[in-house]
Amino acid sequence: MVTSNTNTQMEVGTIMSVLALCSGTPLEPLPLLYIMASARWAYGADRYLDGKTEDTPESIAAALLTANLILWYTDQSKYIAPEILCILLYPSFKRNLPLLKPFYVGTFWAGAISVVPHLIAHTDVIENETIAMGLLASSVSNIADIEDVEDDIKNGIYTIPARFGINPTRALSAGLFLGSVYKSGVRLPHALPSRHMCRPRFFSSPLSFFRKFPL
């Protein structure tokens, strides 16, 4: 099915930007613009290579150029090659190693959310946050493969849901999500409000009123 995915790409970029802010990326123009451009390039190029989008090569290339110019301007040019190759190598990787496809996606999305934006903003990269984002992206990618099971089987691509079924896929995604929550440092029991009970105080000596009462 061929569709126009500009709105979807904007939604993906927005979600990635929010996740980046949650992982400590400063609220600055360049890191967020890089994330939006990378999402536009990665998602658009993937759909274009699969023949599932009406995007023009020029619009996709413009997004890639924007992301690369930001990397060059902030002295992060060493990430330009991975920015390009991660998408160009993705179709062959998905075909040859389909069971590892969610983790491939998770690795590069973690870099685009929690590593490169931090470097652009000259902020320390937090290891646990990067791992958490990688696990979260892997979980989402794994769930997204459920909708493409029929097409993947027709194309000879046996992803996790195509090989093991829907329920095991959901169980794996749930485990990846819980791992993401754990690595992010969120502790649900401590996040919930606790109840404090007022207990009566007992005195070892009688109150003054009773001390004065004649016995």
Protein language model features and the residues they cover:
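A cytosolic-side transmembrane-helix exit/cap motif
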Residues: 48-56, 98-106, 123-127, 146-157, ...
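Functional transmembrane core segments of multi-pass inner-membrane proteins
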Residues: 22, 102-153
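The first (N-terminal) embedded transmembrane alpha-helix
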Residues: 2-19, 106-109
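Transmembrane alpha-helical segments that form the membrane-embedded catalytic/substrate-channel core
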Residues: 37-49, 83-95, 111, 132-149, ...
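Intramembrane alpha-helical segments
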Residues: 35, 43, 53-121
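Helix-coil boundary and interhelical linker segments in multi-pass alpha-helical membrane proteins
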Residues: 15-34, 68-79, 113-131, 183-191
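Solvent-exposed interhelical
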Residues: 35, 39-66, 71-72, 137-180
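Extended hydrophobic alpha-helices typical of membrane-associated regions
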Residues: 53-60, 168, 186-215
